[in-house]
C-alpha cells in the first residue's frame, strides 16, 4: 500500500507523530498535546494530522473495501466532474473509490468528544452535504460524540 497523498503527510510522519500510537485513545491524547509544524498553528495541524489518520483508516479498514483514497487537492478531474465537485476543493476533505467503483466523499472533523458539530457557518456540515450530493455515500469521520 502506498503512503498518504496528503500534502503535509511527509513532514508529519517524518516528525514521528504516529510513532508509539497503539490505539485511538493514544492518538487522541497525543494530538491534544499540541503539535505545531510548518507554522500552521496547533488547531490547523490537529486537523492535518486527523485527515492523514482518516485517509489511512479508510485504506486499511476492510469494512469499506477501498480501492483508492484521494484527499482534497488530489481528486482526479474525471472524478470531480462525475461527482460535480467544485474546483476550489471546498466543503469536503476527500473522495474514496471502492473496489466496486462506488465514489464516496468524506469529511474529517477533529473535535473534543463533547464538542457539538455545527450545521451552518464556518466548518459546518451543510457545505459538505451540499457539495457531496452526487456521491454514493457521504462519510463523516469525527472524534466528537455530538453530531
List PLM regions with ranges.
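Interdomain/boundary linker segments immediately adjacent to catalytic/signaling cores
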Residues: 1-62, 77
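Catalytic centers of nucleases
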Residues: 44-136, 140-146
Amino acid at each position: 500500500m502506498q503512503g498518504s497523498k496528503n500534502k503535509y503527510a511527509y513532514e508529519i510522519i517524518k516528525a514521528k507523530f504516529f510513532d508509539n500510537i497503539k490505539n485511538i485513545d493514544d492518538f487522541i491524547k497525543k494530538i491534544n498535546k499540541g503539535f505545531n509544524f510548518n507554522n500552521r498553528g496547533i488547531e490547523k495541524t490537529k486537523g492535518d494530522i486527523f485527515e492523514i489518520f482518516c485517509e489511512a483508516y479508510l485504506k486499511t479498514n476492510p469494512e469499506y473495501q477501498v480501492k483508492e483514497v484521494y484527499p482534497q487537492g488530489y481528486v482526479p478531474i474525471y472524478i470531480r466532474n462525475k461527482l460535480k465537485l467544485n474546483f476550489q476543493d471546498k466543503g469536503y476533505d476527500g473522495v474514496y473509490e471502492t473496489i466496486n467503483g462506488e465514489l464516496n466523499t468524506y469529511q474529517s472533523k477533529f473535535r473534543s468528544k463533547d464538542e457539538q458539530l455545527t450545521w451552518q457557518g464556518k466548518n459546518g456540515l451543510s457545505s459538505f452535504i451540499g457539495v457531496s450530493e452526487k456521491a454514493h455515500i457521504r462519510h463523516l469521520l469525527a472524534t466528537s460524540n455530538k453530531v
